[in-house]
Amino acid sequence: MRRVCFWAVCLLGWLPARAQELRTVPERTDYEATSRYEDVVAFLQAVTRGSDFLHLRWLDSTVEGRRLPLVIAARGLDPDPQAIARSGRLVVYIQGTIHAGEVEGKEAILELVRALRDGKHAHWLNRLVLLWLPMLNADGNERISPNNRPFQHGPVRGMGQRPNARGLALNRDHMKLESPEIRAFVSLLRRYDPAVTLDLHTTNGSFHGYHLTYSGPLNPNTDPELMRWMRQAFFPQIQHRMAQAGFRTYYYGNFERRDGQEVWATFSHEPRFNNNYVGLRNRIPILSEAYAYIPFRDRIAVTAAFVRAVLDYLTEQADRVQQLIQQAEQHAIALGRSGRDSLGVRFALVRSSERTTILKGAVRTEENPYSGRPMYRLVEDSVRAVEMPEYQAFQATIRERLPRAYYLPPEVASVVLPLLEAHGARL
């Protein structure tokens, strides 16, 4: 009897300890620090070890030679692209740290992959295949300093830098493909063809009252039905679910002055940005921007909640999403063959027909205990609703008829053709 009790006590003591072994760097440091490259790799190796549905794979290397770890969550499937395509499941790609100072996406991804391993959110894998890339800008992630991202509220021991090792802002490189990191991302799009992509960021700038803001595609040449569904069905549902979880969310924007008054305005239509590039490929892009002036712990929490809400809804709407994408593909092919339609080549922001209620918030200044520099923190009691004009959509101001063919002079063909092939164009 004593021997049985002894082993029972040992087992009970071992189980909680083992469950606590796999913790993220923020969890181990009371949210003072973020994960370095070796931390992320070790975590993903541990979380996938022995799993029959979590598979660790690697994308091409960064400027400084770091391979990018990718976790594929696929139940009952070989994780190769062909098997995933044959499964008929909706493929969703979730990406963190394209700007390496914006680190909560990376940490939220690690937490969510661990939750999947532990049996949570199992319903996602009935309809979805999930591709998790916590750290796209791995070189920038290693340049951790408390002086990066001035005024951001943590992590107080520092975060990575915005550009990659060559000084390129990766979220401006989706057309030129000058960086190995974005080339690896576009290669992933071509191989796995995710229907939906999530790009997880931290805001800069305006003192608003939201925990997180979001955006879909903004280029008017994006398939209109995809854009309509995101504005009328998808984002309203996500906003509702986030409110139920206790988070204030809204469309991404900043305060600007236009025509002598304050307005809420979105950012850019340019395809060099991830959300616009993916949208122009007839896929569904989702941009997430956690508020820089809420604590690091809270930014991880709201980002993880946003991803959960998105994946829950996509699980419910997988058939509808696949239908929308198929229709967008057919529509694009028909337009190209007809030669009768046109595309926008110049664009302008459009003012909303009615004034919109936007949340504003004040911040207080706190001192970073490691650098001594000021950090801003949202004062929750200061959040208030203000009506103002909104600029959330672009319209074409100049359009050009779709060409039937392109002529490339020999002196530029050697540059242009490899770039088109890298994007997946059939030549």
Which stretches of residues belong to each language-model region?
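Bacterial N-terminal signal peptides that target proteins for export
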Residues: 1-6
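Hydrophobic h-region of N-terminal signal peptides that target proteins for export
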Residues: 10-18
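Acidic/histidine-rich, surface-exposed loop or edge segments in extracytoplasmic proteins
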Residues: 20-31, 94-96, 168-169, 396-402
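Soluble metallo-hydrolase cores and metallopeptidase-like ectodomains found primarily
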Residues: 38-92
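Active-site-proximal beta-strand/loop segments in catalytic clefts of secreted hydrolases
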Residues: 59-61, 73-75, 96-98, 133-137, ...
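Acidic helix-start/capping segments at beta-turn-to-alpha-helix junctions
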Residues: 61-67, 129-139, 329
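Active-site/substrate-binding loop(s) of hydrolase catalytic cores
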Residues: 85-96, 103-262, 266-272
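Hard-cation-handling environments
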Residues: 255-427
